[in-house]
Amino acid sequence: MFDMYIESGGKKLRCGYTTGSCAAAAAKAATYMLFNKKDISVIEIDTPKNIKLNLEIQDIQVEKNSISCSIVKDGGDDIDATSGLEIFAKAEEVEEGFELCGGEGVGVVTKEGLFVEKGQPAINPVPREMIKKEVLSVLPKDKGVRITIFVPRGREIAKKTFNPRLGIVNGISILGTTGIVYPMSEEALKESIRIEIRQKAVNNKDLVFVFGNMGERFLRERGYKKDNIVVISNYVGFSIECALAQGIKDLTIVGHIGKLSKIAFGCFNTHSRVSDVRLEVIALELTLMGYDLELVQKVLDQKTSEGAVRLLGEDFPMLYERIGEKVLNRLDIYAYGEANFNILMYYGSKEMKLLYESKNSNLFD
């Protein structure tokens, strides 16, 4: 077991290693065994973080002109759909040089805008370099080798990853910029968002941001079909910056009042541990509109913005319009006026109802 830990939220969490590290280790081990005619049980590789990994080799299969083996992906304490997967590499002798191929269970890129060209196996640039470096370190100088990375359960597990959203089909991606998996990594999630924005920006002049699956469901239930929706989690500011960097000038943000209202107070990370001003936004607007303090206090006594909306009912359109306009103003300030923003604000979960839609919104035209 990989014995490296970090602290997050007061908890000690075990790190893991990426699919890229697994592929590099399996490829190195298969190459070594092919040309040295002997089995090994452990292989050492370097990672871009300069952390050495000693990984156990599994499922060695010897054929006439090739050898394959696997490394089991260990995601540590991270919530990782690929943890426990066997990542295989097959090494075959060729006349000269180094070749890298993707086999069964490794996804294929079908859209422009990713770090790998359309039509190529979804093995990202850093893992490609890791695989090549490790293989060449054990490949005899006068020999050539073809490496095929394959993942028997890759098609099945890919359905639980970002790949379907990115247009990567038939398998998982071989990923990792550091070689190490850091549990609950904010940076890893942000990088996934950045990649999706970059990919969606290739064929779209406008993007629609949603905070999660609920926002996407809200749109799909109303017949929205365009492939320009990006799930941004809580990272509003970061996602706007990524979109602007890709030349996107028209952005629509669709979200529950509990998320969107935070932006009215200038909160561009909407996670509750960073910003929890949902009820205060509603209460302030009611006060400014002249409602009595008894009603304002009832709103503040609610546990959620959902509770506040249900308390008030749907007879406060001016309230939601005022909140919506403040959200739009904050978005405009954040982007220095470089983008056109629209918002759709809803409440509810099983049955979602629209509270406010900005005047220039045309999502359903």
From Swiss-Prot:
Pathway as given in its UniProt record: Cofactor biosynthesis; adenosylcobalamin biosynthesis; cob(II)yrinate a,c-diamide from sirohydrochlorin (anaerobic route): step 6/10
Any one GO MF annotation of this record: cobalt-precorrin-5B C1-methyltransferase activity
InterPro entries registered for this protein in UniProt: CbiD, CbiD_sf
Protein's GO biological process: anaerobic cobalamin biosynthetic process; methylation
Catalytic activity line of the entry: Co-precorrin-5B + S-adenosyl-L-methionine = Co-precorrin-6A + S-adenosyl-L-homocysteine
Assigned keywords, A-Z: Cobalamin biosynthesis, Methyltransferase, S-adenosyl-L-methionine, Transferase
Signal peptide from the UniProt entry: none
EC number: 2.1.1.195
Transmembrane segments: none
Domain of life: Bacteria
The family this protein is said to belong to: Belongs to the CbiD family.
Name of the molecule in the record: Cobalt-precorrin-5B C(1)-methyltransferase
